[in-house]
């Protein structure tokens, strides 16, 4: 297994890893930003399940849905912006199984665009205004992530990766 071999080559003992954060590929998950009415936390969870089924193309019975409140909507009073994320139980369970088979204890599991964004926000040179853009170029696909200080957030998975560029060279 590639992960076990990588850990071995780096002389890393999986049992000594205190915090594990991983990402599920954007093509295996869906991310959507929506605007909804401000409501108590108890109501928000069931509302987000309904909203996810409405906005995210996925069979709701097999979906694992999570959300994060991004903040108050700047254009509409009494509304909030929410980031919705969904993937299938099968994708999530396969991801967890892969980590466990490698001797790793699953911790934070995010979707790649959000994991990259969270990592980037720890940088000191994060712009206070304007937009920040991240382009994660993978072998077969890429992720474009755009966000700004006013809770603007956009992500798109692109079916173009570095492998395609090498084929054309």
Can you annotate each of these PLM segments?
Residues 18-23, 123-154, 158, 164:
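Gly/Thr-rich phosphate-binding beta-strand-loop-beta motif of the actin/hexokinase/Hsp70
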